[in-house]
């Protein structure tokens, strides 16, 4: 008997359009698997309203919003559309960035008591926050590039002091990032003090916390990881960027792989780097309490050959050019099998939690 799966995509997020592309790929795979009844739920970018669609369309222009298809969630009661109950066995969120990748939807689904694909509340919330993620990894002696972080209120009160810290502790050039955002949105490289203020202000347009890191010329390595208690680390891949300073938003989504962007799977690594990447991927996954899946990004300095953990993505892209599925496929796990495996992991994680915790103690 087929399970009822709800695929949630879109979202009130700067990465809304990327989510649509990822959802289309996953939806197509679910149709090929023919193991699930798929309920496609689109979250409007402006209003945040959830709509049940007939399918995941290939482009945003084809999405139709009907008031009769609005999805309502009532914890303890169920999911309803037009006063009709939906029996959902598992939820697959593919909203990138805020509300989808930051623990919000994970907490909501947990309140609904439904298995959910991917990381839980804690792992999602820490991983998406570049500042706290780096602080935590550094505390476990996992190498990260030198950085400082600060909130908008602190910057307003001590602008010159923070700029002085950037100059003294990091030295230029530096890379300026919003703390909670993905897909390289709002990221800029500042080469001198005259640029830093402009880029900090721009980063604050996306988040209330900014991270400034020492900019290094580096090889960009990505590593796919799946699993719960037992994890599998796939062969790392490398993104070779020719015409961009780093792998920014335009390079990721506005450029067709070719002369400017080359994906090497496997990445050309010496044995030490390969083993270190797999070890740090394992430890990062463990310390952040991740489950389901993650893409862990690394940097290898072209000057010093040193390795750093860069960022962690708990809902990596599933578009036709995304590296996550390609790395899994290289090691023999097809796109369709990957999607199916992630759903299985969601059921396993849910069952373990139910078996481990005696919920009868809550009964009066």
Curated annotation (Swiss-Prot):
<keyword id="KW-0460">Magnesium</keyword>
<keyword id="KW-0479">Metal-binding</keyword>
<dbReference type="InterPro" id="IPR011127">
    <property type="entry name" value="Dala_Dala_lig_N"/>
</dbReference>
<dbReference type="GO" id="GO:0008716">
    <property type="term" value="F:D-alanine-D-alanine ligase activity"/>
</dbReference>
<dbReference type="InterPro" id="IPR011095">
    <property type="entry name" value="Dala_Dala_lig_C"/>
</dbReference>
<dbReference type="GO" id="GO:0009252">
    <property type="term" value="P:peptidoglycan biosynthetic process"/>
</dbReference>
<feature type="domain" description="ATP-grasp">
    <location>
        <begin position="134"/>
        <end position="344"/>
    </location>
</feature>
<dbReference type="InterPro" id="IPR000291">
    <property type="entry name" value="D-Ala_lig_Van_CS"/>
</dbReference>
<comment type="similarity">
    <text>Belongs to the D-alanine--D-alanine ligase family.</text>
</comment>
<keyword id="KW-0573">Peptidoglycan synthesis</keyword>
<dbReference type="GO" id="GO:0046872">
    <property type="term" value="F:metal ion binding"/>
</dbReference>
<keyword id="KW-0436">Ligase</keyword>
<protein>
    <recommendedName>
        <fullName>D-alanine--D-alanine ligase</fullName>
        <ecNumber>6.3.2.4</ecNumber>
    </recommendedName>
</protein>
<dbReference type="InterPro" id="IPR011761">
    <property type="entry name" value="ATP-grasp"/>
</dbReference>
<comment type="function">
    <text>Cell wall formation.</text>
</comment>
<keyword id="KW-0963">Cytoplasm</keyword>
<comment type="pathway">
    <text>Cell wall biogenesis; peptidoglycan biosynthesis.</text>
</comment>
<dbReference type="InterPro" id="IPR005905">
    <property type="entry name" value="D_ala_D_ala"/>
</dbReference>
<dbReference type="GO" id="GO:0071555">
    <property type="term" value="P:cell wall organization"/>
</dbReference>
<feature type="binding site">
    <location>
        <begin position="167"/>
        <end position="222"/>
    </location>
    <ligand>
        <name>ATP</name>
    </ligand>
</feature>
<keyword id="KW-0961">Cell wall biogenesis/degradation</keyword>
<dbReference type="GO" id="GO:0008360">
    <property type="term" value="P:regulation of cell shape"/>
</dbReference>
<keyword id="KW-0464">Manganese</keyword>
<dbReference type="GO" id="GO:0005524">
    <property type="term" value="F:ATP binding"/>
</dbReference>
<feature type="binding site">
    <location>
        <position position="297"/>
    </location>
    <ligand>
        <name>Mg(2+) 1</name>
    </ligand>
</feature>
<dbReference type="Pfam" id="PF07478">
    <property type="entry name" value="Dala_Dala_lig_C"/>
</dbReference>
<dbReference type="InterPro" id="IPR013815">
    <property type="entry name" value="ATP_grasp_subdomain_1"/>
</dbReference>
<dbReference type="InterPro" id="IPR016185">
    <property type="entry name" value="PreATP-grasp_dom_sf"/>
</dbReference>
<feature type="binding site">
    <location>
        <position position="311"/>
    </location>
    <ligand>
        <name>Mg(2+) 1</name>
    </ligand>
</feature>
<keyword id="KW-0067">ATP-binding</keyword>
<feature type="binding site">
    <location>
        <position position="311"/>
    </location>
    <ligand>
        <name>Mg(2+) 2</name>
    </ligand>
</feature>
<dbReference type="GO" id="GO:0005829">
    <property type="term" value="C:cytosol"/>
</dbReference>
<keyword id="KW-0547">Nucleotide-binding</keyword>
<dbReference type="Pfam" id="PF01820">
    <property type="entry name" value="Dala_Dala_lig_N"/>
</dbReference>
<keyword id="KW-0133">Cell shape</keyword>
<feature type="binding site">
    <location>
        <position position="313"/>
    </location>
    <ligand>
        <name>Mg(2+) 2</name>
    </ligand>
</feature>
